[in-house]
Design a protein with these regions (language model features):
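Residues lining hydrophobic/aromatic ligand-binding pockets adjacent to catalytic sites
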Residues: 1-207
Length: 207
């Protein structure tokens, strides 16, 4: 979802909503729109009355689509009524894997709709707050960590009717590498990663 609706100073204008709906309408019409992701920043806290108004407005405005919300501050998982509110509105609470700090949302959140939605950001704790949009996600999950994530996905798949899982550790192609690994672990069919072929006039180094 576009940043103006979920960013640090979120403002939802009818003009922006109309333009956004117009842009994704072909995807929705032809059944190619899996779900909308509303990603809120770590500073988006439940005890902030403005934040709760924005969350409600996003759900009300885009409720005609399958909607998943990424709430990253622990106040949301510490609160008693977050899960109930999302369940009442049939909104998926995104399961996040990322470095954990005192302010982080809980590692495990309940399933709040018939759709499970996972985002794996990597665990680069050292660069999480001081890195840029590239180095923050410089993290390749180990085979042991892939098994851990696969188990979480498997448990959710037994309860949900629809499931999405995305790797966001996009440094130098780490995400597709880990995606293939978890699909192999879960014994899911997938296409092999394409191997870059040299151009006809490109020098190929001798092995």
């Amino acid at each position: 979802m576009y940043k103006e609706a979920t960013g640090e100073e979120a403002i939802i204008s009818q003009r922006d909503v109309d333009q956004f709906n117009y842009g994704i309408e072909p995807l929705a019409r032809y059944g190619k729109l899996g779900a909308l992701l509303a990603q809120f920043p770590p500073s988006f806290k439940k005890n902030d009355g403005y934040a709760q108004q924005i969350l409600s407005a996003v759900i009300r405005t885009f409720g005609q689509y399958r909607l998943a919300v990424e709430l990253r501050h622990r106040s949301w998982s510490d609160g008693e009524n977050t899960a109930r509110f999302l369940k009442d509105n049939n909104i998926s609470w995104v399961h996040i894997d990322e470095p954990k700090f005192q302010s982080s949302v809980a590692a495990e959140v309940p399933l709040t709709s018939n759709m499970a939605y996972f985002r794996f950001h990597g665990r680069n704790k050292e660069m999480w707050w001081k890195g840029d949009s590239e180095t923050r996600y410089k993290y390749l999950y180990s085979p042991e960590e892939i098994n851990e994530l696969a188990n979480r996905v498997k448990v959710a798949s037994d309860k949900a009717q629809l499931l999405f899982a995305f790797f966001n550790n996009h440094w130098q192609g780490y995400a597709p590498r880990n995606a293939v690994s978890i699909m192999r672990t879960l014994q899911l069919p997938f296409r092999e990663l394409p191997i870059q072929q040299p151009l006809p006039d490109e020098d190929v180094p001798e092995s």
